[in-house]
Amino acid sequence: EVCIPAADKIPLILRETREWLDIYFSGKRPDFTPALAPEGSEFRKMVWEELLKIPYGCIITYGQIAKQVADRKGILRMSAQAVGGAVGHNPIGIIIPCHRVVGTGGNLTGFGGGIRTKEALLKLEGMDMGRFYIPKKGTAL
C-alpha cells in the first residue's frame, strides 16, 4: 500500500517545485522560481545565479556567462570552460536552466540529460531549432 500525504503535509518547497514543473511542462513560463538553495562552491553558485537570469525561450553562450561572472568578480576574464564545469554541476536542472546555455555559434553541447533532451526543452520554450548545430554523435547524446 502506498501512503500519499495530504497536500498540507507536503513541504512548501516540494509543492512549489511541483507547481513550477507542471506549469513549465504545459509549455508556459512560470512566473515564480521555487526558493531552492543548491549547495556548491562560491563560483558554482555565482554561475547558477547567472543561469537563473536567462529568460524563458532565450539562450546564452558559455562565453557570455564567463564575461558576466568576470564582471561580477571584478576581473578581466573568466574561462568559458570553467563556466561549463560549473554548469555541468548544476544540481537542479530545468529550474536552474542550464539547457539554455549553448556553445559558440549555437552548438548544442554539454547537457547532462543528453542533447536530445536539451533540444526538447528548448523546443518546449518555443526556440527555432533550425538555428542550432545539433551533433550526430558525442557530447552526451
Residue ranges and their predicted role:
Residues 19, 23-141:
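Nucleic acid-binding interface residues in structured DNA/RNA-binding domains
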Residues 1-17:
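General nucleic-acid-binding
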